[in-house]
Design a protein with these regions (language model features):
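Short, hydrophobic alpha-helical packing/hinge segments within bilobed ligand-binding/sensory domains
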Residues: 107-108, 136
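Generic beta-strand/beta-sheet core signal
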Residues: 10-11, 38-39, 121
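Acidic donor-binding loop at a coil-to-helix junction in glycosyltransferase catalytic cores
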Residues: 101-107
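Long helical/loop segments within the catalytic core of UDP-sugar-dependent glycosyltransferases
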Residues: 1-5, 19, 23-101, 141-152
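Short beta-strand-to-loop acidic/aromatic patch adjacent to the donor-nucleotide binding site
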Residues: 4-16
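Catalytic donor-sugar/metal-binding loop of nucleotide-sugar-dependent glycosyltransferases
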Residues: 73, 108-126
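Basic/Trp-rich segment in TM-proximal cytosolic loops or flexible interdomain/linker regions
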Residues: 72-73, 131-168
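A short, conserved beta-strand element in the Rossmann-like catalytic core
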Residues: 15-17, 41-44, 106, 126-127
Length: 168
């Protein structure tokens, strides 16, 4: 792969995308971003207070973190699905080599450690969120384990980058 396509979009099988999703995220690609995240909205906002809390968190993440970082010229962060990566990056790595429980965080950290700036595009997609506290708790335990996998793999590289003043 990579010889036919300019970029890949990573989605979960049950994600839904807005009709203009690809054209909006492609604008960021055309602007030079080799990696770009987008706006995750909830498919089931009104199903429970848990799913509503997730949707509110994702709005905050998109508007006040990633959009603000984009406006300031600093790197954004990938979170879950709904993001694009240039085929040049995948080809340059000789394939996809991110297999932790939180490969999104792992790839974001890799980008930061290698001075690859992640952009943000307001391309909207919809993701189903947990409905119960128990389901949310189990998901967050998995995320925590994945975070530590990434930390122990990239912590030294990130500290070296901070010392050198490199911030993607």
């Amino acid at each position: 792969y990579g010889d036919t396509y300019e970029a890949f979009v990573v989605m979960d099988a049950d994600n839904l995308v807005a009709p203009n999703y690809l054209s909006v995220i492609n604008q960021a690609f055309d602007a030079g971003y080799l990696v770009c995240t987008s706006y995750r909205n909830s498919k089931n906002f009104d199903s429970s207070w848990i799913s509503s809390a997730y949707a509110t968190w994702f709005m905050r993440e998109a508007k006040f973190l990633n959009n603000a970082r984009m406006m300031m010229g600093t790197s954004c962060a990938i979170s879950g699905s709904g993001w694009m990566v240039s085929a040049r990056i995948v080809k340059g790595m000789h394939g996809w080599d991110f297999h932790t429980l939180t490969e999104d965080i792992q790839f974001s950290t890799f980008c930061c450690a290698h001075n690859i700036q992640i952009g943000y595009a307001p391309a909207e997609f919809f993701d189903e969120q947990p409905l119960t506290f128990k389901a949310s708790w189990i998901q967050r335990l998995r995320w925590t384990k994945g975070f530590y996998q990434v930390f122990f793999s990239y912590g030294t590289d990130l500290l070296k980058g901070i010392v050198k003043g490199q911030f993607a």
